[in-house]
Amino acid sequence: MALERTFSIIKPDATRRNLTGKINAKFEEAGLRIVAQKRIHMTKAQAGVFYAVHAERPFYDELCEFMASAPVVVQVLEGEGAIAKNREVMGATNPADAAPGTIRAEFAESVGENSVHGSDAPETAAEEIAYFFSGMELVG
């Protein structure tokens, strides 16, 4: 398996409850290194651009409002098979379907407030990383 990078967001429901450290520990326990991280307050406009792929979906406006409702932590994670590993550690989108021990099983409040976002493919990871980080901010 190749060394790769993926993008992650610790969402407002998790930052409100001060879960950043616990979530980061899950990533690190899975062998993922945090090579860039910053806490930001995303604007609704930033969320709208970031989640543009969902613009036609009924939950889009609510998602953008939620993502702008409190600070988030944007991150770049690195490791062997980082994209798949991160998705495994996060668990299913619906916390009711998430495997025990995953981030969403332990911390998510609902399908909408599910604590974390993670890239689903190398192409989206590259786009999402570039949206929030410059190359100089990625320290491997």
From Swiss-Prot:
Binding site for ATP: 11, 59, 87, 93, 104, 114
Gene Ontology terms for molecular function: ATP binding; metal ion binding; nucleoside diphosphate kinase activity
Catalytic reaction annotation: a 2'-deoxyribonucleoside 5'-diphosphate + ATP = a 2'-deoxyribonucleoside 5'-triphosphate + ADP; a ribonucleoside 5'-diphosphate + ATP = a ribonucleoside 5'-triphosphate + ADP
Subcellular location: Cytoplasm
Record Gene3D superfamilies: Nucleoside diphosphate kinase-like domain (3.30.70.141)
Requisite cofactors: Mg(2+)
Superkingdom as given in the UniProt entry: Bacteria
Pfam family, one: NDK
One GO cellular component, as annotated: cytoplasm
Family membership: Belongs to the NDK family.
Function: Major role in the synthesis of nucleoside triphosphates other than ATP. The ATP gamma phosphate is transferred to the NDP beta phosphate via a ping-pong mechanism, using a phosphorylated active-site intermediate.
NCBIfam families registered for this protein in UniProt: PRK00668.1
Subunit relationships: Homotetramer.
Protein's name in the database: Nucleoside diphosphate kinase
Organism: Roseobacter denitrificans (strain ATCC 33942 / OCh 114)
